[in-house]
């Protein structure tokens, strides 16, 4: 784990793929939270559930790499939480997906919720917009580069539902390479060194009024695509 930036309010980290953000059921290895507590013990009382995820305002899946912001005090935690809730934080991701997209840019939106078939997965009803704001999801995407069997996308989620990007790209027929949970049978046996989803940048106005922009370079696996 790499610290990109720190001040009295925030810690910005570059999370590697394979590192869980916080402990969960069956998690025995060290997590991002464990490393943060060693270096920044003051965050142990910060957050909604500080005994499990101190300072954590947003999360990345274990298999996802990239930039994350962590709150260093409760006031900043509440401030950042409000920014995320009101979509005032700009997030961009890189995603390598199977196939060639007909539409080179577009959006996916709809209502998300827990799958009725598998409680461990999320599902999407595309195009369904209800009054339940907590379920609404929206993702913009654009093709950056095309390969023989894959496409590299820049993805901008406008909401923050669990597994949102993974579910949305799967829903349009282009699952993320290396994603074992949201894929099709035809791709399940195709080996990949990782799940190719990377949080590449984060931008927002801090509690001090400063405008911040943080980015994480794509991991080496993204440079080995053919």
Q: PLM features: what roles do these ranges have?
A:
Residues 1-226:
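RNA pseudouridine synthases
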């Amino acid at each position: 784990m790499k610290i990109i930036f720190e001040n009295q309010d925030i810690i910005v980290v570059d999370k590697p793929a394979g590192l869980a953000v916080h402990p969960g059921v069956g998690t025995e290895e060290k997590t991002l939270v464990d490393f943060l507590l060693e270096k920044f013990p003051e965050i142990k009382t910060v957050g909604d559930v500080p005994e499990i995820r101190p300072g954590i305002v947003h999360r990345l899946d274990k298999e996802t790499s990239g930039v994350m912001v962590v709150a260093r005090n409760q006031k900043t935690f509440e401030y950042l939480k409000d920014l995320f809730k009101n979509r005032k934080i700009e997030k961009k991701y890189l995603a390598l997906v199977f196939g060639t997209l007909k539409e080179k840019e577009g959006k996916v939106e709809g209502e998300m919720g827990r799958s009725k078939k598998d409680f461990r997965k999320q599902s999407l009803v595309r195009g369904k917009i209800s009054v339940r704001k907590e379920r609404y999801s929206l993702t913009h995407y654009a093709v950056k580069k095309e390969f023989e069997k894959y496409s590299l996308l820049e993805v901008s989620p406008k909401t923050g539902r669990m597994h949102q990007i993974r579910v949305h790209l799967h829903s349009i027929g282009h699952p993320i390479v290396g994603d074992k949970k949201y894929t099709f049978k035809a791709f399940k046996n195709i080996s990949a060194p990782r799940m190719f989803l990377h949080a590449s940048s984060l931008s927002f106005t801090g509690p001090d009024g400063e405008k911040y922009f943080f980015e994480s370079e794509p991991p080496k696996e993204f440079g080995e695509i053919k």
